[in-house]
Amino acid sequence: MSNSSFNRQWAKVILETLTRHGLRHICIAPGSRSTPLTLAAAANHKLICHTHFDERGLGHLALGLAKATQQPVAVIVTSGTAVANLYPALIEAGLTGERVIFLTADRPPELINCGANQAIRQQGIFASHPSETLSLPRPTADISARWLVSTLDNAMNNLVHGALHVNCPFAEPLYGDDIEHDTPWTQALGKWWQSDKPWLQETLSPSVTTHPQWDRLRQKKGVVIAGRISAKEGIAVAKWASKLGWPLLGDVLSQTGQPLPCADLWLNNPQVKAELNQAEIVIQFGSSLTGKRLLQWQANCSPQMYWVIDAIPGRLDPGHHQGEKFTLSPSQWLTAHPAIDNLPWALSLSHIATQTYQHVTEVTDYFGEAQVAHQLDHLLPHNGQLFVGNSLIVRLIDAFAQLPQGYPVMSNRGASGIDGLLSTSAGVHRATQKPTLTILGDLSALYDLNSLALHQQVYAPNVVIIVNNNGGQIFSMLPTPMAERERFYCMPHALNFKHAAAMFGLDYVAPNCWDDLFTTVTACWQGEAKTTLIELIVNETEGAETLNQLVKQVTAYDFSL
């Protein structure tokens, strides 16, 4: 059998093995060394193949697909710096838990460290960031197909969250003979080919037990913090906290409906602090909290008990509280820890949150990014989803908006980078094929500009709002030196996105008032399946200044009057 044909068989077994663990979407970049993997993916009828010319965007596309499906997604790239371009998406997957399998083609060992073209040291390139790593040998019939299948099965069984990096060296020739489908090497797997089960199956039965003190603790004064959790979990946590009578501090990604909106504006108020300091237990669901004041309160609170519930292992508590971490999903934990009917104990918080929300409405009565953040719920598509960018816009939405309970909200808030946001939102849209609203800043859009190509292929109305405040205006909120702030931090660019939209064949609109924005977005949801890029050219500092102003006003306000 020729080398090219056996390379194809080896790759065929790899891809088929991964489908037994739920793999359906695979993202492929162009490259020669990855030919065996690419052709194996193309030939596997179980797989939906996505392509992109930029490996950094491709990795984030896979991340978005994994976020929305909650299933493993694979990436195929060629050798060399193509592999390094996957680093940001791999890091994000490790922090937010999406299972992404990075299949990186490589030169064989004899071509490493000898000056061969496009050959770099790929083994261990991602250091400690993957949850699992496999460095496969060069394909050879001396290694049984059973070893290859069981090795991959074992890695997938261990991949509870995060990334799996599989480095796959292939020797030339890479092209030539068609694959031989029935050989002694593949026949060793027998009836596995006709099944849909893994070769090596592992059954995990995590025991979820009720905490021995729960009957006593649920009668105490508690506070619930909700970070990044799923839409279903957000609904369940909100109902659970309400039944207990415990105040719920919900992050923008909590999908709880934020029953106490604008918390990041009022958490520093002395009356609020005095009331919340009575909490005897604080229970945090999920992580990646956005608001600065919420993070400060979380770090400074000192209840008798502090519990964190998240399926991702690790502390997930930057406040380093003494307490307990439950590494399981919030839904599993809630089942084992039912609520009882208690009267609310922090009675003033509902009044404070309502007054603050009304004040935000009054202050943001002119067109700008603060108003858009506050009124964002009016722009959401029915039965759709929201993808939120990073930097300033997510903080404004977290502080000013109240999003519907259970409405799907996704973002890259693990490492919170501005790279790969357009490509991640494209993956989210492709996975669900639902109407999708993406909102992000101008620098984020410039950083990932070529990923607008991924928004050409859509399955439902797709709106991308770019809030253009001419640079990184989040830095105007920080005590950066005035003399250097503009040049070295904000970096104004004086660009707009009209020609970028035209380059990628996307519709473009630049409304200059709220009514025009609302009318445009509403028409998009009622129209055909296409992408509309909406650019909001806003005052450079209005959003940051409004946030700072409101924090100061609400912190100093006497809500007892």
Swiss-Prot record:
EC category: transferase
Functional pathway: Quinol/quinone metabolism; 1,4-dihydroxy-2-naphthoate biosynthesis; 1,4-dihydroxy-2-naphthoate from chorismate: step 2/7; Quinol/quinone metabolism; menaquinone biosynthesis
Pfam families reported for this sequence: TPP_enzyme_M_2 (PF16582), TPP_enzyme_N (PF02776)
Biological process terms in GO annotation: menaquinone biosynthetic process
EC number in record: 2.2.1.9
GO molecular function, one term: manganese ion binding
Catalytic activity field: isochorismate + 2-oxoglutarate + H(+) = 5-enolpyruvoyl-6-hydroxy-2-succinyl-cyclohex-3-ene-1-carboxylate + CO2
Keywords: Magnesium, Manganese, Menaquinone biosynthesis, Metal-binding, Thiamine pyrophosphate, Transferase
Keyword Transferase appears in the UniProt entry: yes
Keyword flag Metal-binding: yes
InterPro entries cross-referenced by the UniProt entry: MenaQ_synth_MenD (IPR004433), MenD_middle (IPR032264), THDP-binding (IPR029061), Thiamin_PyroP_enz_TPP-bd_dom (IPR012001)
CDD domains xrefs: TPP_PYR_MenD (cd07037), TPP_SHCHC_synthase (cd02009)
Entry's cofactor comment: Binds 1 thiamine pyrophosphate per subunit.
Cofactor(s) the record lists: Mg(2+); Mn(2+); thiamine diphosphate
Family: Belongs to the TPP enzyme family. MenD subfamily.
HAMAP family for this protein: MenD
Annotated function: Catalyzes the thiamine diphosphate-dependent decarboxylation of 2-oxoglutarate and the subsequent addition of the resulting succinic semialdehyde-thiamine pyrophosphate anion to isochorismate to yield 2-succinyl-5-enolpyruvyl-6-hydroxy-3-cyclohexene-1-carboxylate (SEPHCHC).
Subunit structure: Homodimer.
Name of the protein: 2-succinyl-5-enolpyruvyl-6-hydroxy-3-cyclohexene-1-carboxylate synthase
